[in-house]
Amino acid sequence: GHGCVATVKRALIDALRRRGIDGDGLNPWYFPTVEDYSARLARRGFAVRYIALIPRPTPLPTEINGWLETFAQSFMAPLADNDRAGFIDEVCETLRPDLCDSHGNWTADYVRIRFAADKPRA
């Protein structure tokens, strides 16, 4: 939901901006607000009974660089192959104060959207 990996997204876009690249258009993720998703469901004929954003900080099993290499490829598309490692290192260091604890454990700033909706029978 809205705000999911917001810290990560901001670090990626800022690192691209420092390289003269507009990263906003490279964002592949859709994390809707409650209002936006409710409206989408309603347009498809659903009656929303419950909808909420649920902050869900999620511990990562490894350092965040692996997460970036897996899920943030679209942000790296305009970079030359030999520039990607430095880019990832820069993003990791930007994220460290917010998403890494004093023991070196990383946490992703996930936000879930949870809802219950029914589609009335015609």
What is the predicted role of each segment?
Residues 46, 117-121:
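C-terminal beta-strand of the catalytic ATP-binding
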Residues 26, 102, 106:
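Generic anion/oxyanion-binding catalytic loop in active/binding sites
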Residues 7-11, 36, 66, 86, ...:
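Alpha-helical elements of Rossmann-like donor-binding domains used by nucleotide-donor carbohydrate transfer enzymes
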Residues 2-3, 32, 82, 86, ...:
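Residues at secondary-structure transition points
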Residues 44, 49-103:
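C-terminal helical/coil "lid" or tail adjacent to the Rossmann-like core of SAM-dependent
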Residues 109-116:
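Short hydrophobic/aromatic beta-strand or adjacent loop that forms the aromatic wall/cage
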